[in-house]
């Protein structure tokens, strides 16, 4: 990640720039920005060992780039997203993600 001008963040996703995601075991992430209350980047799964529980700390908007995910939450309908699919989840929503790898998403927490 580079900041060529104050507040402007630029990145190029190369294989060596993926790192383990500390909040989601079994996945890798590439961070674009983590500043001013916004956190954005990419997450990818090449394998998945069962459902992934996830509760966003802020509103999370996702865009599926590869693979498929079904997101279940208590009291709500399950959402199935494929490449091109977008969803925005409120902060604190307890979800279970059923991921079909390979899976890659662009996410923004704000």
Model-flagged regions — what are they?
Residues 72-74, 98:
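A generic structural motif
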């Amino acid at each position: 990640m580079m900041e060529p001008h104050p507040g402007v963040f630029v990145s190029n996703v190369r294989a060596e720039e993926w790192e383990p995601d500390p909040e989601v075991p079994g996945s890798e992430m590439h961070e674009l920005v983590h500043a001013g209350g916004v956190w954005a980047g990419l997450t990818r799964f090449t394998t998945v060992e069962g459902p992934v529980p996830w509760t966003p700390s802020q509103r999370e908007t996702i865009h599926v780039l590869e693979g498929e995910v079904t997101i279940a939450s208590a009291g709500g309908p399950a959402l199935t997203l494929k490449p091109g699919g977008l969803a925005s989840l409120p902060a604190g929503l307890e979800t279970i993600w059923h991921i079909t790898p390979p899976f890659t998403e662009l996410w923004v927490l704000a």
